Curated annotation (Swiss-Prot):
Keywords: Calvin cycle, Carbon dioxide fixation, Chloroplast, Photorespiration, Photosynthesis, Plastid. SMART domains: RuBisCO_small. One of its GO terms (molecular function) is ribulose-bisphosphate carboxylase activity. It comes from Thalassiosira nordenskioeldii (Marine diatom). SUPFAM superfamilies: RuBisCO, small subunit. This is Ribulose bisphosphate carboxylase small subunit. RuBisCO catalyzes two reactions: the carboxylation of D-ribulose 1,5-bisphosphate, the primary event in carbon dioxide fixation, as well as the oxidative fragmentation of the pentose substrate in the photorespiration process. Both reactions occur simultaneously and in competition at the same active site. Although the small subunit is not catalytic it is essential for maximal activity. GO terms for biological process: reductive pentose-phosphate cycle. Pfam families: RuBisCO_small. The keyword Nucleotide-binding does not apply. Heterohexadecamer of 8 large and 8 small subunits. GO terms for cellular component: chloroplast. Belongs to the RuBisCO small chain family.
């Protein structure tokens, strides 16, 4: 099951040339960039691990592409995404985020039902990869 988070998630994977064009677009808007990675694909997992430092005031897309390629070398079997932040309104907020790297296989999710008090049924979504393997060895 393909993880669909962020921009372009329903499209085929972006090539490096397309990623570089999106990074250039964000830089032309004056947005700060960063690279993040995770091996926990849960839809509500918004807190991915930051790769390196945030890239403020970067003028060349090659810098972001270098960081992306370094993250790919180290975290090749997980998810990697690029975020762009707009601080022009005085509040830093993410305005663009897209996945640039995925595991070879994405096992998907299952629905877990738990009986609560009375007739209450509690539903939760869990990842097959998280259930089967500990953190750091999921893909």
């Amino acid at each position: 099951m393909r993880l669909t988070q962020g921009c372009f998630s329903f499209l085929p994977d972006l090539t490096d040339t397309q990623i570089e064009k999106q990074v250039a677009y964000a830089m032309n808007k004056g947005w700060a960039m960063n690279v993040e990675w995770t091996d926990d694909p849960h839809p509500r997992n918004n807190y991915w691990e930051l790769w390196g430092l945030p890239l403020f005031d970067i003028k060349d897309p090659a810098t972001v592409m270098f960081e992306l390629n370094e993250a790919r070398k180290s975290c090749a079997s997980g998810y990697i995404r690029i975020n762009a932040f707009d601080a022009s309104y005085g509040v830093e907020s993410c305005v663009m985020s897209f996945i640039t790297n995925r595991p070879a296989t994405e096992p998907g999710f299952y629905l877990d039902r738990t009986e609560g008090p009375g007739r209450q049924v509690i539903y939760s979504i869990k990842s097959y990869s998280v259930q089967a393997n500990p953190e750091g060895s999921r893909y």
